[in-house]
């Protein structure tokens, strides 16, 4: 069984768990999504071999839409996390996100926080404070065009032209900065923005979790 691990000290680690598919395997009940583990690896190549495995803290239990959101978080992290590079802050963000999903908080806020923190940790932070050309603060009454990995620039866009996927209202950017996503239009704009930003690094291959969830994440 080929398994992708997110670790505190080594970033992403891909490893083979020999015999894990067997009914009596010592790994079978442990190698599950959202289960914190204590794991040892061996091998010199890119793909390691799983050694000892012990249960860590209590497993995260997700159901319904929150399960699909957790799957989305796992897949995005797996696709973007560099193997064998320490990302302690990113691991903490991942852990906090799963714990939050286990609760009853607003899923849109939880996911947008995760995505923004992920991009920042990987060096692609989105500046929601100012126009990258003029360095003027984002204005609630203006419209801005977004370029991934660059930022926002003021545009003469009007409400009639809002179908342009890269154009955002200043009021929505400010609301996202404050994680105030109560308005449906703001939550939709925030999701669109993060799809653009993440898409620049995820590539053209569709996310399986997004397909399962009907494209909503």
Regions found by a protein language model. Give the residues of each.
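Non-catalytic alpha-helical scaffolds and adjoining flexible linkers that form interface surfaces
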Residues: 1, 6-217
